[in-house]
């Protein structure tokens, strides 16, 4: 049985890990190998911590890469020649060079990410995409770089591109969920993180589950907030209605000018005003009269004069007498024409 791609990748990661642990390479070299191991494990869909388990179940039976290569080097030359003649070359040379170039650019981007040089990382991933635009990993990595710079709109676009290229690539949904959550869209983030769990199934890590639970909690908080807002609005409407005057009487002082506000405290005038407002056409009459230039000029004079005008002066004002006659239908007021006084004189 031939080894799977995952098992071969695990062999490589295991080999790099042993070199780093034994300090057989410089610190800069160790950093580069750590980035490489992250990239390889990400590309083949396994965690670095799972390498020993993968190799233990494989046909390699815990062998290291160096042991396997050393065993192969001891194969007789005649057998090597026969094997070489039977190998089919399925990858065109141009394609292999293209992939190698794109992977090198991606590695440079990953190294820039490790150094927190996110702008450089974006540039390198962009170059890799130009070389090989069909690789979902490049878009997902660039989405992570954009999110690190809080450029969440661009991160969403790259994550969606990764998903469209490879719908089974869980990191595309993971990057999308992170960006959507940062944008304040927990419902969409929850949907993306749910997709991650669906794809990974039993292989889902604790980090993936935490992301999902965080988005779920945010959605629940948002729903609770939306539920309380209408209740607060209803309370505000009740308070506003309680602030209106008895019987729905409008603020005539405000309607006719600030100077008349004090007169509205007179009980007799208030009683007359309430009686007037029982007439359905009263407000229409008031609005019509306010279009009269003389009455409007009178109201503006009260508003600009400040204070409450003298009642005797008001009743001697022809415009006001005319307005009262129109509102009260002649009761308690005289029109401005020459109509005689019909009351009995003592």
Curated annotation (Swiss-Prot):
Keywords: Chaperone, Cytoplasm, Phosphoprotein, Repeat, TPR repeat. It comes from the Eukaryota. Residues 219-249, 325-346 are annotated as: Disordered. GO terms for molecular function: identical protein binding; molecular adaptor activity. Residues 228-237 have a biased composition (Basic and acidic residues). It is found in: Cytoplasm. Interacts with HSC82, HSP104, MDY2, SSA1 and SSA2. This is Small glutamine-rich tetratricopeptide repeat-containing protein 2. It comes from Saccharomyces cerevisiae (strain ATCC 204508 / S288c) (Baker's yeast).
